[in-house]
Amino acid sequence: MATPYVEDESGKYIAATQRPDGTWRKPRKVKDGYTPQEEVPVYENKFVKFFKGKPDLPPGMSPGDEAQARQQQQGIPGIAESETAGLSKTAKRNMKRKEKRKLQGPDSNVEALINAVEMPTSNPAEATNDPSGAAAEKAKKIKNLKKKLRQVEELQQKLDSGEIKQATKEQLDKLGRAKAIQDGLLQLEEDS
């Protein structure tokens, strides 16, 4: 929107205008070389100018050749060109993979999962047949049982000394398992 200038013998003026409420604005003097704010071009740095001036076609290619090249380009089957136009190479590859999965059908993955679930699972220590792994497993169990036995003994001492006046149900259950823990510990120590 260019501002209408009025030229007079004393210089350029922006003419007096009437406001919507009926009052008048004063005419304003405009200096030589003044460019109104709305007419000032937007600043563009060198990078932007370079890419605006850069041709869309590769060097040496005519616009007719470009049309032929676009027609020869193959799109992804089953997907319109407009969908893949702005996608990166990786995104296009992922879309191809999705298409393949759709074509294979959802049942192929389900059958593989069912077969995996139906196979009997075994203890990882037995599957490896690694004596050091089995020994480590036993050592871990022995350590765990010794810790539980130590906790039971500490609880019994606290009850005997009167530190704990009334034992809770969980504490009584723990005391009741003391014999089973000792038997399990003895059995593991005999096996090793």
From Swiss-Prot:
Q: Where is composition skewed (Polar residues) in this entry? A: 120-131
Record's keyword terms, sorted: Coiled coil, Cytoplasm, Nonsense-mediated mRNA decay, Nucleus, Translation regulation
Q: Which residues form a coiled coil?
A: 132-171
Single Gene Ontology BP annotation: nuclear-transcribed mRNA catabolic process, nonsense-mediated decay
A single MF term (Gene Ontology): RNA binding
Its GO CC terms are: cytoplasm; exon-exon junction complex; nucleolus; nucleoplasm
Q: Which SUPFAM superfamilies match?
A: Pym (Within the bgcn gene intron protein, WIBG), N-terminal domain
Q: Residues annotated as region Disordered?
A: 51-138
Q: Where is the composition biased (Basic residues)?
A: 90-103
Q: Where in the cell is it found?
A: Cytoplasm; Nucleus, Nucleolus; Nucleus, Nucleoplasm
Question: What family classification does the UniProt entry report for this protein?
Answer: Belongs to the pym family.
The subunit field of the Swiss-Prot or TrEMBL record says: Interacts (via N-terminus) with magoh and rbm8a; the interaction is direct. Associates (eIF2A-like region) with the 40S ribosomal subunit and the 48S preinitiation complex.
Q: What task does this protein carry out?
A: Key regulator of the exon junction complex (EJC), a multiprotein complex that associates immediately upstream of the exon-exon junction on mRNAs and serves as a positional landmark for the intron exon structure of genes and directs post-transcriptional processes in the cytoplasm such as mRNA export, nonsense-mediated mRNA decay (NMD) or translation. Acts as an EJC disassembly factor, allowing translation-dependent EJC removal and recycling by disrupting mature EJC from spliced mRNAs.
Entry protein name: Partner of Y14 and mago B
The species is Salmo salar
